[in-house]
Amino acid sequence: MNTMKRMDCRDLNQSELTQHCAELGLPKFRGRQVFQWVQQKAVQNWEELRNIGAGDRQKLQEGLFLQPLRKVREQIAQDGTRKFLFRCADGETLECVLMDYDRRKNRDRHTVCVSTQIGCAVGCAFCATGLGGWRRNLSPGEILGQVLDITYLMRQEDPDFQVTNIVFMGMGEPLLNYEAVLKAIELLNDPEGQGIGMRRMTISTSGVAPKIRQLAKDNPQVGLAVSLHSAHNTTRDQLIPMNRKYPLEELMEACGDYTTLTNRRITFEIALISGQATLEAAQAVGHLLKGQLAHVNLIPVNPVAGTGMARPTAKEVQQFAQSLESMGIPVSVREEKGTDIDAACGQLRRQLECEQK
């Protein structure tokens, strides 16, 4: 009688799958085959593993489960951005977004913004995700499953579709689900899976200083983006409650340690809000980042019901950027995607929850 705990095959790397197959009485090479089917081809059920006999598939099904996320809703913006609401096995819902960037001379870039938690405990003032509180962490399989299931869906339209970039900027704080995020990165990077280069993945954090240091020591070759939003503790306390635990002084010290250990530039994100995108605010950011290995990404805020925040004018955005550039700070304004479908994280999930009340 098999008393092994049934595991999610999407959580397992090749070595773990090989070991698990051996424990199920299967040849070890089955581990590699299963990994390729699950992680590279993004299969949705065991019957799709065509080079594995029915008897072995039955053993796999008894010892492992393969349970894709179920699409609940999809919204498609005029610019082609797609927002997905998926349901997990326990009934919880999560969001992820597919953004296409046509680079013409190079290959097209297909970026997926993935969630790492159900809800979020950080409670940033301009974010819809935190309005419903934190429910639980996502497993590695649920994190990378967003990429796999989008890939599966898109290959119904284009058999050659391939995700090229990942940003951990969806629902949740990635560094508060640290081990699962790193495992998902490992699996997504495997050349026999999706084969996405680590330099094409970016983790965005609200400022969990100790985990920024740990990330520097563990040194996966991923990008780091820090949600800065203000150079004043009093303002940042209101925008990002995490700042009360890890204030700017501690955050910037951790960022300095990160760049020293990795020699990699950090992207500092500034959400621009009408009435707060002032020249004084820009100059304060410039002084804070002076001498840092840094790039600033300006993000005109998406209006979210329940936050009372509005977008700044184009002139405010331009003046903010020019002020930073005059201080020698590299700056860009985020290319807007999906504004007509509320593509900011948490909005579609919140809409569904409001409808069900």
From Swiss-Prot:
Residues 106-340 form the Radical SAM core domain. It is found in: Cytoplasm. It catalyses: adenosine(2503) in 23S rRNA + 2 reduced [2Fe-2S]-[ferredoxin] + 2 S-adenosyl-L-methionine = 2-methyladenosine(2503) in 23S rRNA + 5'-deoxyadenosine + L-methionine + 2 oxidized [2Fe-2S]-[ferredoxin] + S-adenosyl-L-homocysteine; adenosine(37) in tRNA + 2 reduced [2Fe-2S]-[ferredoxin] + 2 S-adenosyl-L-methionine = 2-methyladenosine(37) in tRNA + 5'-deoxyadenosine + L-methionine + 2 oxidized [2Fe-2S]-[ferredoxin] + S-adenosyl-L-homocysteine. Its cofactor is [4Fe-4S] cluster. It holds the Pfam family RlmN_N. Keywords: 4Fe-4S, Cytoplasm, Disulfide bond, Iron, Iron-sulfur, Metal-binding, Methyltransferase, rRNA processing, S-adenosyl-L-methionine, Transferase, tRNA processing. GO terms for biological process: rRNA base methylation; tRNA methylation. [4Fe-4S] cluster binds at C120, C124, C127. Its EC number is 2.1.1.192. Binds 1 [4Fe-4S] cluster. The cluster is coordinated with 3 cysteines and an exchangeable S-adenosyl-L-methionine. GO terms for molecular function: 4 iron, 4 sulfur cluster binding; metal ion binding; rRNA (adenine(2503)-C2-)-methyltransferase activity; rRNA binding; tRNA (adenine(37)-C2)-methyltransferase activity; tRNA binding. InterPro entries: Aldolase_TIM, Methyltransferase_A, RlmN_N, RNA_MTrfase_RlmN, rRNA_lsu_MTrfase_RlmN/Cfr, rSAM. One of its GO terms (cellular component) is cytoplasm. The active site is at E95 (proton acceptor), C345 (s-methylcysteine intermediate). It is an enzyme of class 2 (transferase). Disulfide bonds join C113-C345. S-adenosyl-L-methionine binds at G172, E173, S204, S227, L228, H229, N302. HAMAP family: RNA_methyltr_RlmN. Reaction proceeds by a ping-pong mechanism involving intermediate methylation of a conserved cysteine residue. Specifically methylates position 2 of adenine 2503 in 23S rRNA and position 2 of adenine 37 in tRNAs. Belongs to the radical SAM superfamily. RlmN family. This is Probable dual-specificity RNA methyltransferase RlmN. The gene is rlmN.
